[in-house]
């Protein structure tokens, strides 16, 4: 338990934590094969200009393969340690990088800092937060591929977000001090959704794919003691 506590401290301090061997070799190979199968079936949502192909429907199409990744036992201590019962899956997205790939500098939760300001206007509102868990399906290493963060990027609001100026935002990210990770097949990186980050292939012919679980903290969790049943999520926020 002390190791988990230390890693939670690291997650808060650094904005990320690398969990080695989160998936067994068998789990990793199964997920990799099914992501490749999804590509063969044409289930991708698209292929963007930087070389990222993404899939948003795999949890619904193949729950027997992808549902075990949600709150996986190797990752649960970190998700639960940060968010407890208020941890909610927002989405599961798989990626394949079929050719050259240099991801744009980006944040998954761009709205974090503005929401942090807005919440101060209200008596009961809680700060929205998000945490990602990315499972890597191949070995990344120097000369092959990597994951890069802006160092301490979860603690500092980047400029050029309001209004958003992507070229200036990306230039700012590129000019900062970075941390570079080389996750191996089966590793999982858990990180704050608002930290600026960038994935890349250093070798164009490298096979590279991953699965990301986006989590968010939702105070009214399923099973909380209340007299009524929740209607769900979509269309239930009248002031949003």
Q: Where are the language model's segments positioned?
A:
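A short secondary-structure junction signal
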Residues: 101-108, 114-117, 143-150, 158-162, ...
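A contiguous catalytic/ligand-binding core that recognizes phosphate-bearing ligands
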Residues: 112-141, 150
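A structural signal for short, well-ordered beta-strand segments
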Residues: 92-94, 133-135, 211-215
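Non-heme Fe(II)-dependent double-stranded beta-helix
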Residues: 1-13, 20-124, 234-237
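Non-heme Fe(II)/2-oxoglutarate
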Residues: 6, 41, 46-47, 163-164, ...
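Double-stranded beta-helix
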Residues: 127-130, 140-198, 220
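Short acidic/polar capping segments at secondary-structure boundaries
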Residues: 94-99, 110, 136-142, 153-156
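Short, surface-exposed loop/helix-turn segments at secondary-structure junctions
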Residues: 107-118, 163-177, 226-231
């Amino acid at each position: 338990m002390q190791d988990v506590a230390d890693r939670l401290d690291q997650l808060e301090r650094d904005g990320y934590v690398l969990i080695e061997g989160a998936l067994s070799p068998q789990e990793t190979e199964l997920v990799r094969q099914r992501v490749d199968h999804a590509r063969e079936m044409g289930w991708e949502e698209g292929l963007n200009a930087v070389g990222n192909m993404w899939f948003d429907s795999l949890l619904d199409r193949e729950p027997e393969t992808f549902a075990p990744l949600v709150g996986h036992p190797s990752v649960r201590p970190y998700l639960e340690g940060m968010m407890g019962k208020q941890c909610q899956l927002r989405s599961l997205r798989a990626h394949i990088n079929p050719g050259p790939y240099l991801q744009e500098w980006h944040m998954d939760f761009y709205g974090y800092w503005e929401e942090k300001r807005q919440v101060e206007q209200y008596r009961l509102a809680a700060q929205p937060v998000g945490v990602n868990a990315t499972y890597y399906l191949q070995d990344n290493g120097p000369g092959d591929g990597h994951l890069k963060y802006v160092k301490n990027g979860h603690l500092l609001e980047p400029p050029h977000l309001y209004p958003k100026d992507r070229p200036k935002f990306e230039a700012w990210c590129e000019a900062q001090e970075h941390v570079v990770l080389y996750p191996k097949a089966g590793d999982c990186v858990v990180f704050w959704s608002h930290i600026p980050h960038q994935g890349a292939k250093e070798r164009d012919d490298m096979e590279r794919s991953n699965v990301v679980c986006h989590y968010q903290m939702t105070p009214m969790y399923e099973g909380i003691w209340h007299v009524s049943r929740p209607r769900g999520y979509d269309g239930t926020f009248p002031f949003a």
